[in-house]
Amino acid sequence: MLNYIQRHFDLQIGISSLLLTIIGLVSVYSATYDARASDIFFKQLAWSGAGTVVLIAMALFPYRLLQTISIPAWLFSLLLLVIVLLLGKTVSGSTSWFNLGSFRIQPSEFAKITTVLALASYLSRSDVSLRNPRDLFLAGGIVLAPVALIMMQPDFGTAVIYGGMAFALIYWGGASQFTLLSVVAPAAAAVGALFGTTPFLIVVAVMGVLIYLTKEHRLVAAVVFSVMVVVGISVQFIYDGMKPYQQKRIDTFLDPGADPLGAGYNILQSKVAIGSGGMFGKGYLHGSQTQLNFIPEQWTDFIFCVPGEEFGFIGAATVLLLFAVFLLRGVTLASKVKSKYASFVAIGLTATIATHVFINIGMALGLFPVIGVPLPFLSYGGSSLLSNAAMVGILMNLYTNRKEY
């Protein structure tokens, strides 16, 4: 029996994701211990049960069929993103959800998976090379299509996740250093511009030198450098066109202390909660910041505060360790499967989870602006939990069929 399980199930991915889900349920219960939010825990429990069904279904899904439907599934997800723009429910300024009674479904969560599958299907073709500008352009189009629709909602946080996933797949696909730098440079210039003229000029100078040293063609290098500069200069115009709540999130990221009772409140309280946990924490259901509701809706964006405050460094480190086990195993799986398609899918799904973890915990620690990115397996949210379960199921499927070409 044990040998059968080891042959067909990746225990490291399975156990780590199971433990993270349990920690998530425990944390959501604590964060919603107040009777006013008591139904949230039971909803999350119901989504966990549904997630188990989704995980099993994806783990048993015919492997060959998975690749066959990759592009059609991606096209269907694009259709859903268009429909949600027209008929979806607007929450916190974003038209991202379909209402299903007392539950809401967010199509962009599932579009992440179909985008990974579609991009993996394209990159695994024998006639595709990322050193060919045409192939690179088409690969970028697969990612930019859903990103453009998501930005129209607008949902910047979800759109950012696609960037991390796409970068990992392009890197895994053998893109040159210059190509990778071409992807990073505009983003670096944009971030530098947010901090002011001097940081922007420093980024432009450093990236300019790197672009020159890695250039494959002078004209292309000049175009990349120009795009980087234009993106950086355009940031201020984009900022001026943002909605007030989006501007506040960026301002809070740059200086949380400037408005400690307003826009910066959540980040400051989050840092207090995590920092006050000490080594072993204050005890379950005894966190002052979490139990006294100092952090609004802490069961979503700031769920990491709960284990950090109530179980201290040990609790926070345990969560990080479990994520490390999951992510390292995902990369290992990507390097060991025989199929090129399976390898791309594994690295794409792993990178998607990794980007979520990196940004969410960065938000909780005040290292990133609050952009509404949930912590996988822990944060409250049905769409997020179902998509996480689907990703685990697909990884299990790849492990079972790891010797297939």
Predicted regions: what is each one?
Residues 5-6, 136, 292-295, 337-338:
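Helix-boundary and loop/linker segments of multi-pass membrane transporters
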Residues 1-18:
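N-terminal membrane topogenic signal
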Residues 14-30, 34-262, 305, 309-365, ...:
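Hydrophobic alpha-helical transmembrane segments of multi-pass inner membrane proteins, especially
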Residues 32, 182, 285-286, 320, ...:
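Proline- and acidic/polar-enriched loop/turn elements at helix boundaries
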Residues 155-160, 282-287, 298-300, 371, ...:
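Transmembrane helix boundary and interhelical junction motifs in multipass membrane proteins
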Residues 1, 360-405:
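A juxtamembrane structural motif centered on a specific transmembrane helix
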Residues 252-300, 311-315:
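TM-adjacent membrane-interface loops and short helices in multi-pass inner/ER membrane proteins
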